[in-house]
From Swiss-Prot:
It comes from Homo sapiens (Human). It catalyses: a medium-chain fatty acid + ATP + CoA = a medium-chain fatty acyl-CoA + AMP + diphosphate; benzoate + ATP + CoA = benzoyl-CoA + AMP + diphosphate; hexanoate + ATP + CoA = hexanoyl-CoA + AMP + diphosphate; butanoate + ATP + CoA = butanoyl-CoA + AMP + diphosphate. The gene is ACSM2A. Pfam families: AMP-binding (PF00501), AMP-binding_C (PF13193). Residues 1-46 form a transit peptide. This is Acyl-coenzyme A synthetase ACSM2A, mitochondrial. ATP binds at residues 221-229, 359-364, 446, 461, 557.
Length: 577
């Protein structure tokens, strides 16, 4: 662990490996080392190198047993594990996956669970066994699940009651799928029961010695055209990067952090698992079956939560309540990510709670990219400076770095040194990976401005992705769902401004002639319900406008940009392209 405590600013030479997993860097070396000139150990595994370290400290009496995972369901049921218990329980999970299920190193495992303790155990079990985990939201429908299982050639899926029927509907169309593992109190034909197997499994598992650059996770990330891409992360781009980022929020070993996130988001693995545990801190989890601001406020008032991470919509919805009725005696650090934090949200939260909100920025492919750390000055409307291991710049269309105050594309320098934290690439799609590199930089697909102090201001997305309440939604996915309805001849989906969600999905629809006389209000509800039934409900168009035709290029391509520009201009708000 000595090297792991010294990796702040650590980056990796692409393709370089060390002969030892131990890297010793003294404080004098740390001061002199520049970005991109450090190496990483050849072997790294978050479970054995980090989690088990804290467990061993507890066993040796060098650390008082304290909560590592504190889970509540809001109905009186609570669970609390220290690091020793978490280590043993996750070793049981690894034995279930590699033993009872017969999965082997490198196999891909889809994980579709709500915020239950088993999600954390399954992820750690995959890490220990060298399996590639692929988290997904429980809001997925059968078509979403089918696509992910077929594209990834997943050998197993771990799921709960929420999606069991959706999985069974398509399982026969997935030839690679061998194991269906159910996290439930009940049994189901064709499924192994995870809880039963976990209770029977040994608490001792020999952790696989995984390579730092070895594949650890795949996240399906939405694009503006086509279906979601498979973004692959390594053990170092997730685990080591999380260790380097840990503490930027002000979190310490004795603290409790609550990350309000969907388990299908990369935010959950980073901020509700790796970053707090890298520091030996506790992650707090509320089942929160549905988003309820009153439940969140009561929880903050009742539990010793020191740090809270959530998308800006969390704070906006909390501010809609009467905060004078609540006291947060322990809360000190409030952090946000997922979309831009409006200055008025920051000001209102500060006025009513006395607390700041520190903004951060990143994406599935890069993790935490910019942030306002605990020691930094907050500039309303700015998302902070670059993460320690990243050289983030604003570049022009040729890849040249632009001077402060100039708008351009946000990029991370990946040549000649590829920094730790950058994902490995899009699986089976090298052309798409290469297309996101301009000159020496990885393009994040967003526009921004960098000021004289190195703070970045987000100006908008350079593509068509819709960011609604932190959910990234590709327009083509919604368009495909709408086109399945007989009333729809053509459709174009864009973002539309919303005071609470930031953006919502809006669909422009050209109707079939036989539906032109239908009641527009009733047809709108029918189309919305149709989308909810065939894909994840958060993607449904909250706004639908019926039109006679759509703007197109001379080659017949629908011009979403024209529709989007008009939509945002009508609202009086700007959304940079």
């Amino acid at each position: 662990m000595h090297w792991l405590r010294k990796v702040q600013g650590l980056c990796t030479l692409w393709g370089t490996q060390m002969s030892s997993r131990t890297l010793y860097i003294n404080s004098r070396q740390l001061v002199s080392l520049q970005w991109g000139h450090q190496e990483v150990p050849a072997k790294f595994n978050f479970a054995s190198d980090v989690l088990d370290h804290w467990a061993d400290m507890e066993k040796a009496g060098k650390r008082l047993p304290s909560p590592a995972l504190w889970w509540v369901n809001g109905k009186g049921k609570e669970l609390m594990w220290n690091f020793r218990e978490l280590s043993e329980n996750s070793q049981q999970a690894a034995n279930v996956l590699s033993g009872a299920c017969g999965l082997q190193r490198g196999d891909r495992v889809a994980v579709v669970l709500p915020r239950v303790p088993e999600w954390w155990l399954v992820i750690l079990g995959c890490i220990r066994a060298g399996l590639i985990f692929m988290p997904g939201t429980i809001q997925m429908k059968s078509t979403d699940i089918l696509y992910r299982l077929q594209m990834s050639k997943a050998k197993a899926i771990v799921a709960g009651d929420e999606v069991i029927q959706e999985v069974d509907t398509v399982a026969s169309e997935c030839p690679s799928l061998r194991i269906k593992l159910l996290v439930s109190e009940k049994s189901c034909d064709g499924w192994l029961n995870f809880k039963k197997l976990l209770n029977e499994a040994s608490t001792t598992h020999h952790c696989v010695e995984t390579g730092s650059q070895e594949a650890s996770a795949i996240y399906f990330t939405s694009g503006t055209s086509g279906l979601p891409k498979m973004a692959e992360h390594s053990y170092s781009s997730l685990g080591l990067k999380a260790k380097m980022d840990a503490g930027w929020t002000g979190l310490q070993a004795s603290d409790i952090m609550w990350t309000i996130s969907d388990t299908g988001w990369i935010l959950n693995i980073l901020c509700s698992l790796m970053e707090p545990w890298a520091l030996g801190a506790c992650t707090f989890v509320h089942l929160l079956p549905k988003f309820d601001p009153l439940v969140i406020l009561k929880t903050l008032s009742s539990y010793p939560i020191k740090s809270m991470m959530g998308a800006p919509i969390v704070y906006r919805m909390l501010l809609q309540q009467d905060l004078s009725s609540y006291k947060f005696p322990h809360l000190q650090n409030c952090v946000t990510v997922g979309e831009s934090l409006l200055p008025e949200t920051l000001e209102n939260w500060r006025a009513q709670t006395g607390l700041d909100i520190r903004e951060s920025y990143g994406q599935t492919e890069t993790g935490l990219t910019c942030m306002v750390s605990k020691t930094m000055k907050i500039k309303p409307g700015y998302m902070g400076t670059a993460a320690s291991c990243y050289d983030v710049q604003i570049i022009d269309d040729k890849g040249n770095v632009l001077p402060p105050g100039t708008e351009g594309d946000i990029g991370i320098r990946v040549k000649p040194i590829r920094p730790i934290g950058i994902f490995s690439g899009y699986v089976d799609n090298p052309d798409k990976t290469a297309a996101n590199i301009r000159g020496d930089f990885w393009l994040l697909g967003d526009r921004g401005i960098k000021d004289e102090d190195g703070y970045f201001q987000f100006m908008g997305r350079a593509n068509d992705i819709i960011n609604s309440s932190g959910y990234r939604i590709g327009p083509s996915e919604v368009e495909n769902a709408l086109m399945e309805h007989p009333a729809v001849v053509e459709t174009a989906v864009i973002s539309s401004p919303d005071p609470v969600r930031g953006e919502v999905v809006k669909a422009f629809v050209v109707l079939a002639s036989q539906f032109l006389s239908h009641d527009p209000e009733q047809l709108t509800k029918e189309l919305q319900q149709h989308v909810k039934s065939v894909t994840a409900p958060y993607k449904y168009p909250r706004k639908i406008e019926f039109v006679l035709n759509l703007p197109k290029t001379v080659t017949g391509k629908i011009q979403r940009a024209k529709l989007r520009d008009k939509e945002w201009k009508m609202s009086g708000k700007a959304r940079a392209q």
